[in-house]
Design a protein with these regions (language model features):
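Positively charged n-region of N-terminal signal peptides that target proteins for export
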Residues: 1-4
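N-terminal signal peptide c-region/cleavage motif recognized by signal peptidases
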Residues: 14-16
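PEST-like low-complexity, intrinsically disordered acidic/proline/serine-rich tracts
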Residues: 18-271
Length: 271
């Protein structure tokens, strides 16, 4: 009887072992020959990063968080926002975010770049002194991050993407950006900012399929102190950025082809 019991136990453990062996192996982050983390697809492969997560959660908005918020998600009440900026934020939500620049095909930096349905690509090539971040769409938006040790210019011309310099902190890419204009929203929920905005972004490819994105916002024109949050980017293997019709002031494709006479803003979906 003991022999039978022991045999059954061995078979059971073997079955568990086989089941465990068939589980997908977690791949480590790819690296270039010099040891630098590759933030994109390995040579000969394709893929892009998909975000979509909110950086903040705002009471009574279209992205309610059920249950316990994930780590890194910042509640609006925890953001040290100035009264005028909070009033502007409330006004944007009263208009159902209808004035958001990104939905009018304007480029957007910081967290907003990762809160779309279309993905982004990160390209870092050792020896070039540059890292590029590409966004999909007809606007052909991309950022250049200078990795050659330079500083920000004293009189930088304000732009949507600002002026970005970067460096490696171990396996984490750190990007310091200043010189923003006020023509964009830095996240999908409409957080205001001023030309004093200064951001620090940290990209950590924790494994082949994941990047932890951390953002620190410092804008004394709109907030009483610096604050930050984080989100996760997911790797979509075998995919590439694609073209779609997107021009400034193009409110709807239907208007261009004459099927409708007005824009329907009743949908909760924000591109």
């Amino acid at each position: 009887m003991r022999v039978v019991t022991f045999a059954v136990l061995i078979m059971s453990l073997s079955a568990v072992s086989v089941a465990q062996d068939t589980r997908p192996v977690r791949q480590s982050a790819p690296r270039w020959p010099d040891g630098t983390i590759n933030l994109g697809a390995p040579p000969g492969q394709t893929g892009m990063w998909d975000g979509g997560e909110p950086l903040t959660t705002i009471p009574n908005n279209y992205e309610k968080v059920g249950g316990r918020p994930r780590p890194g998600l910042v509640h609006l009440d925890q953001i040290p926002i100035q009264p005028w900026a909070r009033a502007l934020l409330d006004a944007r939500h009263a208009r159902f975010l209808a004035d958001e620049p990104y939905t009018r095909c304007k480029p957007s930096p910081a967290a907003r770049a990762f809160q779309t349905a279309y993905g982004i690509e990160l390209l870092n090539l050792p020896g070039t002194g540059r890292i590029y971040l590409f966004q999909t769409g007809g606007a052909h938006s991309f950022r250049v991050i200078y990795m050659d040790g330079r500083s920000h210019p004293r009189d930088v011309q304000p732009t949507n993407f600002g002026h970005s310099i970067g460096w490696w902190d171990g396996d984490t890419l750190v990007i310091d950006t200043a010189g923003f204009n006020e023509g964009f929203w830095m996240d999908r929920d409409g957080l205001p900012h001023t030309s004093q905005l200064h951001t620090i972004e940290r990209f950590t490819r924790t494994d082949f399929s994941s990047i932890r994105y951390e953002l620190t916002v410092d804008d004394p024109g709109a907030y009483t102190s610096a604050f930050g949050g984080q989100m996760n980017l997911r790797w979509e293997a075998g995919t590439e950025l694609f073209e779609y019709q997107c021009q400034q002031m193009n409110y709807a494709n239907e208007l261009m082809v004459g099927q409708f006479e007005k824009v329907d803003r009743s949908s909760f979906i924000i591109p």
